[in-house]
């Protein structure tokens, strides 16, 4: 896995730089990455949005999406990730995806705040 990541991540990063350059005039851009904190991407963005859900819900969703994965497989993956509580603690913004909060209104609120300038958001710099 390490070898694959060492080959893949530089190419993905290079592709992203090109994409970002073509969108440099946008008010803001988003970058999705499941392991932002773990692989250091959090240092290359201005703000972090964490989508948070309890572990039991995350496990159920992965099993529904990837029927070949067992609960134990998923728990092993989660164990190698930064704890959810730490991600939430480090986040600038949190979207709760826990079956108790409606996700779309949270997203629309952030979008409106970013567009209006109510929340200061700087574009990423291409390094």
What do the PLM-derived regions correspond to, one by one?
Residues 18-20, 37-40, 83-85:
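Short, flexible, glycine/charge-rich loop motifs used to bind or transfer phosphoryl groups or to couple energy/partner
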Residues 30, 42-65:
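Conserved phosphate-donor/acceptor-positioning beta-strand/loop module used by diverse small-molecule
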Residues 12, 24, 43-44, 65-116, ...:
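Small-molecule kinase domains that catalyze NTP-dependent phosphoryl transfer to phosphate-bearing small molecules
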Residues 1-28:
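ATP-dependent small-molecule kinase phosphotransfer cores
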Residues 5, 62, 107:
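Short, flexible helix/strand-to-coil boundary loops that buttress conserved ligand/catalytic motifs
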Residues 28-38:
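Switch II (G3) loop of P-loop NTPases
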Residues 33-34, 52-53, 98:
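Glycine-rich, N-terminal phosphate-binding loop of Rossmann-like dinucleotide-binding domains
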Residues 38-39, 57, 103:
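Short glycine-rich, flexible loops that bind phosphorylated cofactors or substrates
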């Amino acid at each position: 896995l390490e070898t694959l990541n060492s080959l893949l991540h530089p190419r993905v990063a290079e592709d992203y730089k090109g994409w970002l350059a073509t969108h440099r005039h946008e008010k803001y851009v988003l970058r999705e990455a499941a392991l932002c904190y773990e692989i250091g991407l959090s240092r290359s963005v201005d703000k972090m949005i964490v989508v948070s859900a309890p572990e039991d819900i995350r496990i159920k969703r992965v099993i529904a999406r990837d029927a070949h994965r067992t609960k134990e497989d998923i728990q092993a993956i989660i164990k190698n990730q930064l704890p959810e509580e730490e991600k939430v603690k480090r986040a600038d913004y949190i979207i709760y995806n826990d079956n108790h909060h409606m996700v779309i209104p949270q997203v629309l609120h952030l979008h409106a705040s970013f567009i209006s300038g109510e929340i200061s958001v700087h574009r990423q710099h291409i390094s």
